[in-house]
């Protein structure tokens, strides 16, 4: 997804509610990952859903959705990350 080139007051005012919503989705394991580029121009979200329509329904609930352009939804065949693996055992 692409974010606006500049953030106006309306966009900035929505950020706290958007972050709260993303945090809730992370806690509920609906969102697996959420990232924004360092220049704040692009974002990536990995969402668990039954199909594209279910994922789009989640994205459309984002408080910042109407500011986003170029939202693409791709179904993943494989998603592997260190965060999704079992924790290492520590022998104290």
For the regions a protein language model found, what residue spans apply to each?
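Short, well-ordered beta-strand segments in beta-rich or mixed alpha/beta enzyme
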Residues: 1-2, 35-62
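Short S/T/G/P-rich N-terminal loop/turn motif that feeds into the first structured element of a domain
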Residues: 1-33, 39-40, 83-92
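Generic structural motif
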Residues: 4-6, 50, 76-81
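Short, surface-exposed linear patches
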Residues: 18-23, 54-57, 67-71
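Residue-level marker of positions within ordered structural domains that often coincide
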Residues: 23, 60, 78
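A short linear boundary/processing microfeature
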Residues: 28, 61-65
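Glycine-rich beta-strand-turn "strand-cap" elements at beta-sheet edges
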Residues: 37-38, 64-92
């Amino acid at each position: 997804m692409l974010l606006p080139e500049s953030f106006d007051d309306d966009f900035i005012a929505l950020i706290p509610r958007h972050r709260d919503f993303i945090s809730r989705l992370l806690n509920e394991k609906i969102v697996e990952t959420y990232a924004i580029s360092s220049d704040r121009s692009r974002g990536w979200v990995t969402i668990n859903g039954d199909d594209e329509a279910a994922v789009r329904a989640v994205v459309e609930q984002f408080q910042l959705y109407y500011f986003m352009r170029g939202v693409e939804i791709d179904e993943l065949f494989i998603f592997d990350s260190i965060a999704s693996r079992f924790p290492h055992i520590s022998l104290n």
